[in-house]
Amino acid sequence: MQTTTQVKTPVVGKHVYGELYGVDEELLRDQEKLRKIVIEAAHIAKMHLVEVNSWKFKGGDKEGVSVIALVLESHIAIHTWPTYNYATVDVYTCGEHSDPMAAFRYIVSQLAPKRFTVNYSDRSYR
């Protein structure tokens, strides 16, 4: 009797996320510009774009824009708070071929914060 052994390949999850401070208030309100930035970030990071959705929220100090790109590998998200000149960025990918840090760096270069934090989490199964 012949036995077949199935080899499991690891799930490669890479999560890059951070906070951006001191970003231009008008840029953080510009829904179309933010959408274009997210789409270009997906291309730069070698991700396969499935769909992009965005929402503009109004209401005092809680106004802002959220842009979420569903990519074949997972997602890219930007959430903004213009009143605070603040944004959060989240880039998560599965697979070895995409580069979430490249997407994050591109987004930071386009939003030009006065300062930012970046975090990396290896979310791989071993």
UniProtKB/Swiss-Prot annotation:
Q: How is it modified after translation?
A: Is synthesized initially as an inactive proenzyme. Formation of the active enzyme involves a self-maturation process in which the active site pyruvoyl group is generated from an internal serine residue via an autocatalytic post-translational modification. Two non-identical subunits are generated from the proenzyme in this reaction, and the pyruvate is formed at the N-terminus of the alpha chain, which is derived from the carboxyl end of the proenzyme.
Instruction: Give the protein's cofactors.
Output: pyruvate
The EC number(s) attached to this protein equal: 4.1.1.19
The record places the active site at S74, H79, C94
What remark does the entry make about the cofactor?
A: Binds 1 pyruvoyl group covalently per subunit.
Q: Which GO cellular component term is one of those annotated?
A: cytosol
Q: Which SUPFAM superfamilies match?
A: S-adenosylmethionine decarboxylase
Q: Which Gene3D superfamilies does the entry mention?
A: S-adenosylmethionine decarboxylase
Source organism superkingdom: Archaea
Q: What class of enzyme is it?
A: lyase
Would you tell me the protein name for this molecule? Arginine decarboxylase proenzyme
Q: Which organism is it from?
A: Pyrobaculum neutrophilum (strain DSM 2338 / JCM 9278 / NBRC 100436 / V24Sta)
